From Swiss-Prot:
Known catalytic reactions: (R)-pantothenate + ATP = (R)-4'-phosphopantothenate + ADP + H(+)
Principal place of residence: cytoplasm
Protein name as it appears in the record: Type III pantothenate kinase
Enzyme Commission designation: 2.7.1.33
Gene name per UniProt: coaX
Pathway(s) the chain acts in: Cofactor biosynthesis; coenzyme A biosynthesis; CoA from (R)-pantothenate: step 1/5
Length: 263
């Protein structure tokens, strides 16, 4: 392998409803990882300025980054980031969608309904954790994605995210305050805020654990449970349901898919 090939870098971009997760890979190594807010009104020039500043701080040259892969659940931001990379990096991103090889067979009523982020997570789990697997991605929504023993995507569940639930209870009531989402020391709250924090945190754990148990029962076997997403580490503090916590699962899936589709 020549020196140029050995130092090629890949930009992996996961565009979610709340944040944009950007990772820079050199081979298998994740060199840098940043999160930017998902703001549909933000212009490509603004995102480019933020990204270029982060790259400079990390000592990474923009000219090194001509390989880009993205998955997105926010169509307006897909267009924005395509413009960012075409204009400032002279790169045309590979966008995960129809016609892109993922290595995952989707056994759903309508495979096109499955979000790109869920396919990417499945692609990562299939490579990293072969066999039956339940992926719990805890973000704006909480998704439960199930892989069979043979690595086929067979469906899952979608529930509100913990922050979404906390926001809803504030918006739908007159007197309940906004709270910080934490791991409370006990379930019995001694005031309104601590009672809300208990209900949101431990109630959410109950939701996650019950859905995982039901999926396990329907599978008829013990599947490996992998947690990812912005709240994975916090929730794992209060639950033993997870076998693995992998915050970079989606970025790793993007890397695998890029390798499958590169010319």
């Amino acid at each position: 392998m020549n020196k140029q090939a050995a130092t090629e870098k890949l930009v992996a971009v996961d565009i979610g409803n709340t944040s944009v997760n950007i990772g820079i890979f050199e081979g298998e190594q994740l060199l840098a990882n940043w999160h930017l807010g998902s703001v549909a009104q933000r212009m490509a020039d603004e995102y480019a300025s933020l990204l270029l500043g982060l790259l400079q701080h990390a000592g990474i040259q923009a000219g090194e980054l001509n390989r880009v892969i993205m998955c997105s659940v926010v169509p307006p931001l897909t267009t924005t980031f395509e413009e960012v990379f075409k204009t400032y990096f002279k790169a045309t991103p590979l966008v995960v969608g129809a016609g892109i090889k993922s290595g995952v067979k989707i056994r759903m009523d309508n495979p096109r309904e499955v979000g790109a982020d869920r396919i990417v997570n499945a692609a990562a789990a299939r490579v990293l954790y072969p066999g039956a697997c339940i992926i719990v991605d805890m973000g704006t929504a909480t998704t439960f994605d199930t892989l069979s023993e043979s690595g086929e995507y067979i469906g899952g569940a979608i529930a509100p995210g913990i922050a979404t639930s906390a926001q809803a209870i504030v918006e739908k009531t007159s007197k309940l305050p906004k709270i910080e989402i934490i791991h409370p020391a006990k379930a019995i709250g001694s005031n309104t805020v601590s009672a809300m924090q208990s209900g949101v945190y431990f109630g959410y754990i109950g939701l996650v654990e019950e859905l995982v148990r039901r999926i396990q029962a329907e599978l008829g076997q013990k599947a490996r449970v992998v947690a990812t997403g912005g709240y994975a580490s916090l929730i794992a503090e209060g639950s033993r349901i997870f076998d693995i916590v992998r915050s970079d699962l989606t970025l790793q899936g993007l890397r695998f898919i890029y390798q499958m589709n590169k010319v």
